[in-house]
Amino acid sequence: KHKLNKSPEEVLNAIKESVSYARKFTDDVEWSCEDGTRTDMDYMCKTVELAINSGAKTINIPDTVGYTVPSEFKKIIETLINKVPNIDKATLSTHCHNDLGLAVANSLAGVMAGARQIECTINGIGERAGNAALEEVVMAMRTRHDLMPYTTNINTKLLSKASKVVSNATGFPVQFNKAVV
């Protein structure tokens, strides 16, 4: 409603058509629930179930405008896990924007609730205030392995170097007191 300007039925038809079409070209289709964190939960559950039935293997829940706080994001992921009957056939993913400075916290809340993929960027680079910073996500998960017992294949010794490479390539300086790097 907020971003797509389509009726609920038009959105459902678009999901079925687009995911089915994408499956003609690849088995690994990721579907994103545009503006998901401001969507009615019952309707979101319906869209996620349809996307999975249409062939999506990853369900991405974006906080498109960086509006959500961690307790809300956690509840969204928990609700999807508890109410979408075929959720076990897909990987739940997060894609959080940093407009309120909560992208990393929301992403981690999603993981703690059951999401298994985080979409993030080096230095948090992204539109408007940016996205969840990869280096912060990785180090938080590594440091707080007691709460998030998951691993990545990221060589943490290279995070600072990667940060500098991205900064030099984009021309966006890294703030002097940036967390982690």
What are the residue ranges of the model-derived segments?
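Small-aliphatic-rich amphipathic alpha-helix that forms the alpha element of a beta-alpha
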Residues: 98-121
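Alpha/beta enzyme core
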Residues: 1-92, 107-115
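Beta-strand segments within the central parallel beta-sheet cores of soluble alpha/beta enzyme folds
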Residues: 61, 90-96, 120-123, 151-159, ...
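Hydrophobic alpha-helical scaffolding
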Residues: 8, 34-37, 66-70, 96-100, ...
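Mobile "lid/hinge" segments at catalytic clefts and subdomain interfaces of large enzymes
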Residues: 123-147, 181
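Glycine-rich phosphate-binding loop at the start of an alpha helix
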Residues: 45, 101-105, 131
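Conserved thiamine diphosphate
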Residues: 19, 24, 139-151
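A mid-to-C-terminal "edge-of-domain" accessory segment
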Residues: 145-181
